[in-house]
Amino acid sequence: MTFNVSPEHKAQLLQDRITALNLEGYQNELNLKSAEALGNQEVIDQATANIAVIQSAIAVHEAELADLA
């Protein structure tokens, strides 16, 4: 399904989401550092997985944004 959203609104939404994803990624990097300092492997694994998903999402959003240009 295609929604009726102007290119300007799409671009703003994508840019806002990229910013939010970067902030979320930064928080996960901090969580990873804390977990590494404590030797908490479960949190290390989760933060590492979260970072990979966030990086992928950023790439998808950036590609969509580039397609609008």
Q: Which residues are covered by each model-predicted region?
A:
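Short, charge-rich amphipathic interface segments used for partner binding and complex assembly
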Residues: 19-69
